[in-house]
Amino acid sequence: VSLLNSLSVIAAAFTGFIILNSVLIIAGSLVGASGLILTVIMCKAMNRNLYDVLFKSFGGDGLEERLTRTKVGSEPEEISMILDGAQKVIIVPGYGMAVSQCQHQVKEFADLLSEKYGTEIKYAIHPVAGRMPGHMNVLLAEANVPYEQLIEMDEINPEMAEADLALVIGANDTCNPAGRGDEGPLAGMPIIDVDLAQTIVVVKRSLAVGYAGVDNDLFYMDKTLMLFGDGKQMITDLNSAIKDS
């Protein structure tokens, strides 16, 4: 997407040369260059080169994967009881948080835990979470999340095993253990090691696969609890359950 965006404004820059419009030339060159840089950054974050992204399959074999496994959903009240006494909680935001626009509810959730239980809160940020690098940072900054709580993937991974609970909000491929394997569309892709946390809570509409078309084993682990539904509604209900507990 970022490459196509950059090519579109580069075309605008060439149009500027044709009609002798310096504004189009300058603006097109600047935005086009930034788009190309963004493309390179995202390729590195996915451990892929540009050729593979453009000409090789990344979303499976094109056939919809049939999910034969099931997982019983949990209730916000159950999650709130687990959170009572949690010393460290790591929040892992993904594209689903952006879609549901629940960053303010997530900030309220973090504040409730800090004030009520004295819980240490951190946010694990994957380089390609969302639609572009920095997408999650922008959304959380909008909700006034302290910058020092936003931790990049490489820095937060060593801490995941220390977390009493990891809350995954709308993330899928970026925390799929299949990234550690040697085969499949996600092979070799850096991931957030959510599966190392003591307890895992995933807020997601369903068990559907992510962009790569790969089922996520994280969802079916015994220590994983699923909150099925809209992100904003689920976090709002969870906040209410914490207040009432």
Model-derived features: where do they sit?
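Membrane-interfacial segments at transmembrane helix termini in multi-pass membrane proteins
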Residues: 26-86
